[in-house]
Amino acid sequence: MSEIAVRNWLNAMSESIARRDLAAHMALVSRKVQVYGLPGDRVVDYDGWHQRRRNELRRGLLASLSYDDLAMRQITLRRVRFNVNETMTAATGACVIINKDVILEQEDGEHWRVVEENIRHWEHGKQQTRNVG
């Protein structure tokens, strides 16, 4: 997997939220996913991720996901590890910037899905002034 393919995966994540397409979004997430680094040492699995995104999309809470500062860390035949800043923008315009390490794995011989995220740092960003609805 090249950096271009990682960028395509990140774009697909963003587009799935912009289209409010939960099925397309979850197709990018492995059923064995684990998210670490949350408050209280909680770990989020596939069901937790699905429940949260379903709630955010049904209630119109999450307006967009965007990514920047991509740094490739390791590439193997079936796995790639990278660091990225993810900006989650709410429908209210509030945003959270999350720095995280991400591991994608090729599943089913062709589909790249996230299998692990390690949240390193997050901060509340400035209120977005553009129309995000």
Task: Kindly label every feature range from the protein language model.
Residues 29, 39, 71, 86-88, ...:
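A mature extracytoplasmic/lumenal domain signature
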Residues 10-13, 17, 29, 33, ...:
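Hydrophobic alpha-helical core bundles mediating ligand binding, dimerization, or RNAP-core interactions
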